[in-house]
Design a protein with these regions (language model features):
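C-terminal lobe substrate-recognition/regulatory segment of protein kinase catalytic domains
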Residues: 243-289
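Conserved N-lobe beta3->alphaC-helix segment of eukaryotic protein kinase catalytic domains
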Residues: 44, 48-74, 89-92
């Protein structure tokens, strides 16, 4: 891992004033994201501000990771980092240099599109979204990279319907050796059960769980498991996917938190039953069932998911450009009203705080890009 004090090698522009900021489209603990335009070329871009609050620590590790990984990943379904811009140190910024990551501009994120009831996805268009998402995952996993923050807000879509995986601040390289990665990754509502139970030797299956959550969201229009705490999230997972036991998931009893957390007992698996009210396609339900497998060793991988019958029977995947051409305004989660909670679960006995879908229970991971 590159030390924090080492600067990244990437095309640099000397001054961020070459861009005119047009609108703020994102906000989080990482800073702000702006839609901007190159004053000379008129190219529209997205500028992600990198917070440099503690310069003694050097370049922030999340931004450094994102830059390093995006230098390697070049694919139609991965957001393209164009350059890095520095703002000059002035009295206005307390003589602290501000850094911006400049990305290609995508008109929408998936969470923003799903927040708008006027945006209607046909089954064929949902297939196209998921096909592109899984193709992006297949590409990064083939290059030994884990995304580790799969969620609808991190799925960007251009006005012509091209899908881009974005926000690689939590991404990292992985190997097939025994590893000890942090399990404090992935936004809570999309976090797979193995991470919630303390697994540190994980792989691409964590991203496929997130893909399953996002796929279900294409019909429910809201995150399907909105836990308030890790315990609550495990309860919701058990209610949908069945009780977590060594019988259905061999080896789970070895995970650090398996005996320390009270897990619901006697829960039957109800993925197809609970989602059938939204998802009428039998092939879609079958793929969802495979993506939301509790056991990561049995969870379908991106290659097998792309070969699933869901994508190869009528209606075949259909480009999104015609549907999106009816919507002239950009749609981002940051700019959208809260989405309603998806009523696919019976709520647990303890009272829960009802949070809008735009709210992230893990503030550390709240990002748009």
């Amino acid at each position: 891992m590159m030390p924090k004090t080492e600067e990244p090698t990437y095309p640099l522009c000397p001054d961020e004033t070459k861009y005119e900021k047009l609108a703020k489209i994102g906000q989080g603990t990482f800073g702000e994201v702006f839609k901007a335009r190159d004053k000379k070329t008129k190219l529209v871009v997205a500028m992600k501000k990198v917070l440099m609050e503690n310069e003694k620590e050097g370049f922030p590790i999340t931004a450094l990771r994102e830059i390093k990984i995006l230098q390697v990943l070049k694919n139609d379904n991965i957001v393209n980092l164009l350059e890095i811009c520095r703002a000059k140190a002035t009295p206005y910024n307390r003589f602290k240099s501000t850094v911006y990551l400049v990305f290609e501009f995508c008109e929408h994120d998936l969470a923003g599109l799903l927040s708008n009831p006027q945006v209607k996805f046909s089954l064929a268009e949902i297939k196209k979204v998921m096909q592109q998402l899984l193709n992006g995952l297949y590409y990064i996993h083939s290059n030994k990279i884990l995304h580790r923050d799969m969620k609808a807000a991190n799925i960007l879509i251009t006005k012509t319907g091209k899908l881009k995986l974005a926000d690689f601040g939590l991404a990292r390289a992985f190997s097939d050796k025994l590893n000890r990665y942090t399990n404090r990754v992935v936004t809570l509502w999309y976090r797979p059960p193995e991470l919630l139970l303390g697994e540190r030797n994980y792989g691409p299956a964590i991203d496929l769980w997130g893909a399953g959550c996002i796929m279900a969201e294409m019909w429910t229009r809201s995150p399907i498991m909105q836990g308030n705490t890790e315990q609550h999230q495990l309860t919701l997972i058990s209610q949908l996917c069945g009780s977590i036991t060594a019988e259905i998931w061999p080896g789970v009893e070895k995970l650090d938190l398996f005996t320390k957390i009270e897990l619901p007992k006697g829960q039957k698996r109800k993925v197809k039953e609970r989602l059938h009210g939204y998802v009428k396609d039998q092939y879609a339900l079958d793929l969802l069932d495979k993506l939301l497998n509790l056991d990561p060793t049995k969870r379908v991988n991106s290659d097998d998911a792309l070969n699933h019958d869901f994508f190869w029977v009528d209606p075949l995947p259909q480009d999104l450009n015609h549907m999106l051409s009816r919507h002239s305004k950009s749609m981002f989660e940051y700019l959208a009203p809260p989405r309603r909670r998806a009523p696919i679960h019976q709520q647990p006995q303890q009272p829960g705080v009802v949070r809008p879908a735009g709210h992230n229970p893990d503030q550390h991971f709240e990002r748009i890009f």
